Amino acid sequence: DFYGSGSSKTGHHTPLGSDRFKEGSAVSSIQALMNLGVKPEKIIIGAAFYIKTFKEVENINNGLDQNAVSSRSYNQINFEEVRSDFNFHWDASANAPYAYDSINKIFATFDDHKSIQLKSQYALEHNLGGIMFWQLMNDKKQNGLLKTMVDAIKEN
């Protein structure tokens, strides 16, 4: 995770690309490994089937790159219980989704269907060893992120 329980600012915890604020991403990490001589087929890209949240986040830039206090993690199932409180956004430079609850001042970072599809395609296009996720019990039983991952791999 690029952002999580030790972070004092919000950010994407599992971005494919680098966002406009930070350099950490799956792509930059993969490139760093390849620059060290690691063969692409030995590299596995990761995806998160859980949501990290931050509280006490000011309503600036929809909560992205703001001072915050790390809060809790959700799985895909229990996040549905609070989903209606959030406005969802897509960061095109990071290829990552995020959400912000302006009433409760909570920022959420996660992978979604689109980011999982992009990561799966990236793994295939760059001849990586594969894609992994953590953790299956956090996914929905119907139309979850694993299905998106499998479908993206089958399509390519």
Spans of features found by a protein language model:
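Beta-sheet entry/capping signal
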Residues: 42-44, 129-132
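Acidic-and-aromatic substrate-binding clefts and catalytic sites of carbohydrate-active enzymes
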Residues: 136-142
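Acidic carboxylate-rich catalytic motifs and surrounding loops in phosphoryl-/glycosyl-chemistry enzymes
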Residues: 48-49, 134-136
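Substrate-binding surface in catalytic domains of secreted glycosidases
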Residues: 1-79
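Glycan-binding loop/region signatures in secreted carbohydrate-active enzymes
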Residues: 44-122, 148-156
